[in-house]
């Protein structure tokens, strides 16, 4: 192993990018920097009411450059010379259209302000009808069921649904695009100077979980399937978009001289393959087989790795894919998740904070900026106070039952038509109690995922949680522990995704021979373990049964044939 070797992990989240420099031998996290996407912060190119969320590629380019340069500037001269690799993870499915030169269309002047020419963020749900069309065709009997290895349901959050939606909606983008690319694959291609779409290495993780790629049918679905779905998918797009895939520990190239100079790092830096944030975060957390890893943020992604012998030829229904090598080579990566977790809390905070925002505007107009500042400070602490107030008197006797479908449902059985539901309100329901219902709802969603695995013979032997909410909100995590009735281990690092990316870079650069070996040196430890409270477990079991009852009652109201207002 190279003494003093350092790798950098890049973690592209929904709001920001994080760069993390890690010592490959000790696992010490040397320096980190977070940079928020400027256009995204201004709300550009997004229409939340229409479920449209887009990222301009310049947000990624500018932010990654700033983040890495800050991290590098804090290292010593000697440390800078020991930077040997960069690993990348991102949200997903977050694809964008590219031209014959591998350029994102939004980087061309004629598409600079066209949201359809940008990255379609994972939580963009504009492609619900297209996802349903994919599911219908897969179940028609005309073709094999190409959804069988991704849980049996294709989601509007995923690759082909988004391509189909944009292609149908925007003729200019449809004519200009020759291929589409996931964010986690584009960044390594950008930094390594790989331009021709056919030369860009596509990650096993994104391809297997979101693009209907599987070796049993030779890669992507055949051209006649895509043509039957819509001829627009075969008119101008290259076919196949790609055939081969690579696991993320494999090198995809060396950084270009231009990028090395811009970032202040050696020209010998190796780029590892890209993968989705939660799969990479699972590696950063040091997870072992049959450990359910909950990566908790605005949403959750739940990852479990299993050996091929136990899964064999079985397909696990209702999840977001089972892919050989999507997490660690040699193991099947199983993915699930909740479409909203922290986003639900944030929505409730915005709802209650509206009056504070309006009052702040009034005070500013009246020449009292100090009062505006005070109100803004109150709003910033609103969720913290709600959590504390509910924790001081966490009565479960009159807890509202909330369905955690505020951004649709990812698992079990993806359905993005679903909406959030709040039940069991009365005139005595106050804000902290209702917020307690929101906390319980996210925990109920977590339990439903665990049961989806266990009910199909996939054991969950351990549960880990990582991310900002996991580390900073013991109240919420204790509710999850009680609802799941399992010990819950909290991972020490709050940047496991970037850490996992650095681990993949260490293997790609040849510092470690494989991912398990690299994990022994670099993965995070456990900060603390929460244990279930037996009395609260029993009460939550009753509430969970009511949650399930409401799920069964509410879901039919959001079917496409329902007369209910969506």
From Swiss-Prot:
InterPro entries assigned to the protein according to its UniProt record, in alphabetical order: ATPase_NBD, FGGY_C, Ribulokinase
Ion transport as UniProt keyword: no
Record-listed E.C. numbers: 2.7.1.16
Catalytic activity reported: D-ribulose + ATP = D-ribulose 5-phosphate + ADP + H(+); L-ribulose + ATP = L-ribulose 5-phosphate + ADP + H(+)
Domain of life assignment: Bacteria
Cellular component aspect of the GO annotation: cytoplasm
Keyword annotations from UniProtKB, A to Z: Arabinose catabolism, ATP-binding, Carbohydrate metabolism, Kinase, Nucleotide-binding, Transferase
NADP keyword on record: no
Pfam name, any one: FGGY_C
GO biological process: L-arabinose catabolic process to xylulose 5-phosphate
An example Gene Ontology molecular-function term: ATP binding
Pathway terms, separated by semicolons: Carbohydrate degradation; L-arabinose degradation via L-ribulose; D-xylulose 5-phosphate from L-arabinose (bacterial route): step 2/3
PANTHER family listed in its UniProt record: FGGY CARBOHYDRATE KINASE DOMAIN-CONTAINING PROTEIN, RIBULOKINASE
Stored HAMAP family: Ribulokinase
Family: Belongs to the ribulokinase family.
Protein name, entry field: Ribulokinase
